[in-house]
């Protein structure tokens, strides 16, 4: 068996065209979605990622700005900048690029974002709504994973899904989204004993721990769907996933590559959530 490759680049491209059409329809009514990103410091990876978001937003007709603050910026000044964006009626969505410098509390900053502009879906109010099945902003990587599965017409009902990783960014929210689709979900983590026992029985595997080569061909049953969220750079700067891609694709039914799988969908869902935020505050269905 040769796995179906879930090409996140192409799926994201198609999805963004639909978003572009919706942005144009909004503009015809006099509204243009605006995404504001706060970046504190000069971390190279963060700068690259923020620039990718800005470019992607502008490509579909949105306005995007990067509020770049110095590495030494105090927590109070970051919160003041956030307050300004919360109150700015031209801003549809806000996200704060993490990690933040040590002097700035990530939790305090994320809790200070207006929940109606929280396009990353990390505000406690939005996380809470997700867990009681209310409409809310969903974290972008889990949402992107679900769109990949949906695009590939993968039926999740009654399937055994294993999620490796329990972070609030990916592992826990994607587990909740899989539950909403009536999958039976098991979460594995660093204290799990005999991880392979769970993997071998899984119909769906989502790995999001940043450990290259964690999942091998021997761990995966034939026909399983394998989603790789890992993106760890090796000594040459090449991104490696958690899955041994070349060997696992020989047995999997479908698999995401790294890079080019989940990553493009994450940025696309930032745009999706920004569009939703603009529609919600304008009372547009």
Swiss-Prot record:
It catalyses: (6R)-5,10-methylene-5,6,7,8-tetrahydrofolate + NADP(+) = (6R)-5,10-methenyltetrahydrofolate + NADPH; (6R)-5,10-methenyltetrahydrofolate + H2O = (6R)-10-formyltetrahydrofolate + H(+). Pathway: One-carbon metabolism; tetrahydrofolate interconversion. One of its GO terms (molecular function) is methylenetetrahydrofolate dehydrogenase (NADP+) activity. Its EC number is 1.5.1.5, 3.5.4.9. Keywords: Amino-acid biosynthesis, Histidine biosynthesis, Hydrolase, Methionine biosynthesis, Multifunctional enzyme, NADP, One-carbon metabolism, Oxidoreductase, Purine biosynthesis. Catalyzes the oxidation of 5,10-methylenetetrahydrofolate to 5,10-methenyltetrahydrofolate and then the hydrolysis of 5,10-methenyltetrahydrofolate to 10-formyltetrahydrofolate. SUPFAM superfamilies: Aminoacid dehydrogenase-like, N-terminal domain (SSF53223), NAD(P)-binding Rossmann-fold domains (SSF51735). Gene3D superfamilies: Leucine Dehydrogenase, chain A, domain 1, NAD(P)-binding Rossmann-like Domain. Homodimer. GO terms for biological process: L-histidine biosynthetic process; methionine biosynthetic process; purine nucleotide biosynthetic process; tetrahydrofolate interconversion. InterPro entries: Aminoacid_DH-like_N_sf (IPR046346), NAD(P)-bd_dom_sf (IPR036291), THF_DH/CycHdrlase (IPR000672), THF_DH/CycHdrlase_cat_dom (IPR020630), THF_DH/CycHdrlase_CS (IPR020867), THF_DH/CycHdrlase_NAD-bd_dom (IPR020631). Belongs to the tetrahydrofolate dehydrogenase/cyclohydrolase family. It comes from Staphylococcus saprophyticus subsp. saprophyticus (strain ATCC 15305 / DSM 20229 / NCIMB 8711 / NCTC 7292 / S-41). This is Bifunctional protein FolD. GO terms for cellular component: cytosol.
């Amino acid at each position: 068996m040769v796995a179906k490759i879930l090409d996140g680049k192409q799926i994201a491209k198609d999805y963004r065209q639909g978003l572009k059409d919706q942005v144009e329809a909004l503009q015809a009514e006099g509204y243009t979605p605006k995404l504001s990103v706060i970046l504190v410091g000069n971390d190279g990876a963060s700068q690259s990622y923020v620039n990718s978001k800005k470019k992607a937003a502008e490509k579909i007709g949105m306005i995007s700005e990067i509020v770049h603050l110095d590495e030494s910026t105090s927590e109070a000044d970051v919160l003041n900048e956030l307050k300004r964006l919360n109150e700015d009626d031209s801003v549809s969505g806000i996200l704060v690029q993490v990690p933040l410098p040590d002097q700035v509390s990530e939790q305090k900053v994320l809790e200070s974002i207006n929940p109606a502009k929280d396009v990353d879906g990390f505000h406690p109010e939005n996380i809470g709504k997700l867990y009681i099945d209310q409409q809310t902003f969903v974290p972008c990587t889990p949402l992107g994973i679900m769109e990949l599965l949906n695009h590939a017409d993968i039926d999740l009902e009654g399937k055994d899904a294993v999620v490796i990783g329990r972070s609030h960014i990916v592992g826990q929210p994607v587990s909740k989204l899989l539950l909403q689709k009536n999958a039976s979900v098991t979460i594995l983590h660093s204290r799990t004993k005999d991880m392979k026992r769970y993997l071998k029985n899984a119909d769906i595997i989502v790995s999001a721990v940043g450990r290259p080569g964690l999942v091998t061909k021997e761990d995966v049953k034939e026909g399983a769907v394998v989603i790789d969220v890992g993106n760890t750079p090796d000594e040459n700067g090449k991104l490696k996933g958690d899955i041994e891609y070349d060997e696992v694709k020989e047995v999997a039914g479908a698999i995401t590559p790294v890079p080019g799988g989940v990553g493009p969908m994450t940025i696309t869902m930032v745009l999706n959530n920004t569009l939703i935020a603009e529609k919600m505050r304008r009372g547009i269905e």
